């Protein structure tokens, strides 16, 4: 038995290179920005790159936005109460008629805007966020597989089919975002680019021996998956 498990990572574009062995895996989305995003874009209204970079942050934050929670209850005389609660999620695009955020949130937004005020500050912000995944970030999805390559390929196929469907049927986006049956479908519905998705895998092939059979490995991996779901609450998990 080895002293340490094998850990590796693959872009969704490259999952054909994943090992054909049992293991655990987690999907992450990386933040992508380049000089064209942080360099100054002069205009009559000032530097357009500030708003452009803020929109880039909003899009990235939106990948992690939880779905609304449905609530229901009963009152006196059989009255029924129903509704949903949405998290006051940071950086959400303001909508007309929406309630104004509290003073603390507005102050934090002002501080954020100051950190995007110059080309160099935007570059530093981009570098921090690019380095943060996966070290500081919560996974989008955690899974267990008997054959890692086969499972990751299935995720890619689900993503591709959902992406192609939504291109022609954009009206189905919210339904798939909320009730998509697979990680690939839900990721496509959140408009996450395939090339931004990366799977980190724990390969258990070297752990198999006379005392730890493939069945034992699967059971152990499933127990670890159950625990990791409850610790990290991956936003695109089965829940």
Q: How should these model regions be labeled?
A:
Residues 1-239:
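Boundary/linker segments flanking structured domains
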